[in-house]
Amino acid sequence: PLLVSCRWHERRAAGLLNRGIALGYAVPGSVIAVGILIPVTRLDHAIAALWQSLGQPHPGLLLTGGLAALVYGYLVRFLSVAVQTVDTGLSRITVSMDEAARSLGRGRGALLREVHLPLLRGSLASAALLVFVDTMKELPATLVMRPFNFDTLATQVYTLAADERLAEASTAALAIVAVGVLPLILLSRHIAQGTQPQDG
């Protein structure tokens, strides 16, 4: 919806948005993690202080002690991947399509639901696959921001390899490769089917 809104108002706004979002993918994951943890930790303590001022027991660190901060870090880190993929699909939807739908009495909500979403279905699926693969193998941000007793495949490989338990680490490493390759195979098949010439 954000990209569509920029498309409706001004293409320059979409360009500025893309450049701003791209910073998250350009900056190392560990830097993003530290930059997020500092304000989020302060917010955590402020929430706890407010909760205690109401006569309630200390709730703990709700954001940094759970998955909320980690998910937010992934959002900052990989939003650029999703936005670029969807923006590529959105560029194939011409303005004349929007004008034709509006001439038939469709408002912006109906235009988004009945025209844009069906045409962007492939781009949305591709964006989800790419973000999934990138998130699965992300290590620096996960190591810094993960809560206690929470591991991903990437952190498990790192921990086992650091302990020189290479045989055990290989299982998780192969799982990362397998899970990462399968979506890419599906994505390449989808792209190949979309580029095949139509008969007749």
PLM features: residue spans?
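Hydrophobic alpha-helical membrane-insertion segments
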Residues: 21-37
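Transmembrane alpha-helices
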Residues: 23, 27, 76, 83-86, ...
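C-terminal transmembrane helix and the adjacent membrane-cytosol boundary/short C-terminal tail
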Residues: 5, 87-98, 102, 106-114, ...
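Membrane-interfacial helix termini and adjacent extracytoplasmic/periplasmic loops
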Residues: 9-17, 33-75, 109, 145-148
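Membrane-cytosol interface at the C-terminal ends of specific transmembrane alpha-helices
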Residues: 61-102, 127-128
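Hydrophobic residues within alpha-helical transmembrane segments
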Residues: 20-23, 72, 125, 129, ...
